[in-house]
Amino acid sequence: MSRRYTPLAWVLLALLGLGAAQDCGSIVSRGKWGALASKCSQRLRQPVRYVVVSHTAGSVCNTPASCQRQAQNVQYYHVRERGWCDVGYNFLIGEDGLVYEGRGWNTLGAHSGPTWNPIAIGISFMGNYMHRVPPASALRAAQSLLACGAARGYLTPNYEVKGHRDVQQTLSPGDELYKIIQQWPHYRRV
């Protein structure tokens, strides 16, 4: 009798696993971190094949309160100083292990120049990673976000991760973070 239920058990396990893969974890909404209203209107065509990882090269944040302030600072710089329609990144990663929604999955970013912005999601780690690595919680948050994006169809199943320095002349995402993302399974050199 237990053999009769074995296929059903496998189907149940598969469905539960799929549900877990689609869990986007802790994404802090724009409203929760106090974002200014976006003035962006250009949509990003999905699914997206590329993800560009950068760092803000700014202050570190390691608590939800400090990361919310840092996300506001980044947005302020992009909107007020650079004249952009919003924060340039689709998502920001805090050292508190949380993902902060920037432009999100559906809006064209301003993170990697005119060639890559229309075809890539931009994820930026808040902090400077030239000489130190982000904490494991931040790296896990980024990996979880990418798995979610692929599971929900925002990213192609064979999406490719690039470092910011792979697509533009820059030191971003910092030497130490760059070493780490080169080990990620979806990393591909240009």
From Swiss-Prot:
It is found in: Secreted; Cytoplasmic granule. It comes from the Eukaryota. Disulfide bonds join C24-C148, C40-C85, C61-C67. Belongs to the N-acetylmuramoyl-L-alanine amidase 2 family. One of its GO terms (cellular component) is extracellular space. Innate immunity protein that plays several important functions in antimicrobial and antitumor defense systems. Acts as a pattern receptor that binds to murein peptidoglycans (PGN) of Gram-positive bacteria and thus provides bactericidal activity. Forms an equimolar complex with heat shock protein HSPA1A and induces programmed cell death through apoptosis and necroptosis in tumor cell lines by activating the TNFR1 receptor on the target cell membrane. In addition, acts in complex with the Ca(2+)-binding protein S100A4 as a chemoattractant able to induce lymphocyte movement. The modification Pyrrolidone carboxylic acid is found at Q22. GO terms for molecular function: Hsp70 protein binding; molecular adaptor activity; N-acetylmuramoyl-L-alanine amidase activity; peptidoglycan binding; peptidoglycan immune receptor activity; receptor ligand activity; zinc ion binding. The keyword Disulfide bond applies. CDD domains: PGRP (cd06583). This is Peptidoglycan recognition protein 1. The gene is PGLYRP1. PANTHER family: PEPTIDOGLYCAN RECOGNITION PROTEIN, PEPTIDOGLYCAN RECOGNITION PROTEIN 1.
